[in-house]
């Protein structure tokens, strides 16, 4: 981030606005709405800005800027039509340690104004970090059209009931879960429909019947994070990820996905490379139980789909044995996601009538598969975690009847901006990549459908 979004209480603070024209007027309106006291300095000041200054309880000085104008102010806005004047005012303000905004010239200042969607007390700020104010305004317009006007009333209602809920529930986790459930309840629709008294009665009744024991009960979410691209995360996965108190994630989950977790969530890295586990599987299982028994909502975030070579079944075994509530959220498995991004349809009427997923290595590191059932010319075979065993995979397929000229693809870091697709022949690919640096995770696709990659390959990172 180039700029840190913050919410700053300006009520009762003096803001110096250098400039008296249309640009200064726009900033003056915004500052007045925030409760700031305006001091305007400019050789000429438009009537509307002068009126805003009076209503804010501030003052207007009709002359050029002087250093003494900086005395006693909390922030400075430079909005004159002269860049050198703006630069000089900004320089003097910064020498005093005052935060400065230079309109339409962020390089000279310390902060910028975002586009704002105002549903007070709910505020949404949108910024392009000065790169494209037009883009920020467009995003704001889209949000304005979709966000109900009465969200602010809902926030006010929740604020009024915060203390009664604290009196009822001492556990902060239980209170957070109560509010999450409230936001999925008919209370919201009542407020949005203008039926405030009905909403208030429903909320009061819900607080009265709130059960700390039930709300404090731990739960485990086994969530498939998909093959890498955060855009492939499901809505349910995102919702539970942002609800979790603790997130256990492994190497196959990209940082862009982990960053979607709640800012105050505890993040626990558990590794899970092919043969180098930061934590053994048994320890991971025990951690899930440990956190859940503390009453926490635990998200076990796994690359791909939890039930397709994700060892999700092993993790659920202990959870079930301990009587802990759990949910399983499917994810787009690597075979589907990586093949799609590589432009390789796993089935095709003219090439393959079936597809088979197999693991490229076992617990002991071997590649011991039922090879005779993997050589059908009308079937696509996808190998997970097969990079280390690639040479053996190719030789065994050929030895059991698959043609040496069968197309094969190796997809590295699929669906991400670092995706690489290497195609070749079954009898040549191991030699083709000898000495090349191939990054995990990888996926191997064998079958004539691979020949469609040059034609269908649409993703160009």
Swiss-Prot record:
Name assigned to this protein: Siroheme synthase
Catalytic residue list: 250, 272
PANTHER family, A to Z: SIROHEME SYNTHASE, SIROHEME SYNTHASE-RELATED
NCBIfam families: cobA_cysG_Cterm, cysG_Nterm, PRK06136.1, PRK10637.1
Superkingdom assignment: Bacteria
In-chain residues carrying the UniProt-annotated modification Phosphoserine: 128
Pathway field: Cofactor biosynthesis; adenosylcobalamin biosynthesis; precorrin-2 from uroporphyrinogen III: step 1/1; Cofactor biosynthesis; adenosylcobalamin biosynthesis; sirohydrochlorin from precorrin-2: step 1/1; Porphyrin-containing compound metabolism; siroheme biosynthesis; precorrin-2 from uroporphyrinogen III: step 1/1; Porphyrin-containing compound metabolism; siroheme biosynthesis; siroheme from sirohydrochlorin: step 1/1
UniProt organism field: Alcanivorax borkumensis (strain ATCC 700651 / DSM 11573 / NCIMB 13689 / SK2)
Catalytic activity: uroporphyrinogen III + 2 S-adenosyl-L-methionine = precorrin-2 + 2 S-adenosyl-L-homocysteine + H(+); precorrin-2 + NAD(+) = sirohydrochlorin + NADH + 2 H(+); siroheme + 2 H(+) = sirohydrochlorin + Fe(2+)
Recorded name of the encoding gene: cysG
Entry similarity comment: In the N-terminal section; belongs to the precorrin-2 dehydrogenase / sirohydrochlorin ferrochelatase family. In the C-terminal section; belongs to the precorrin methyltransferase family.
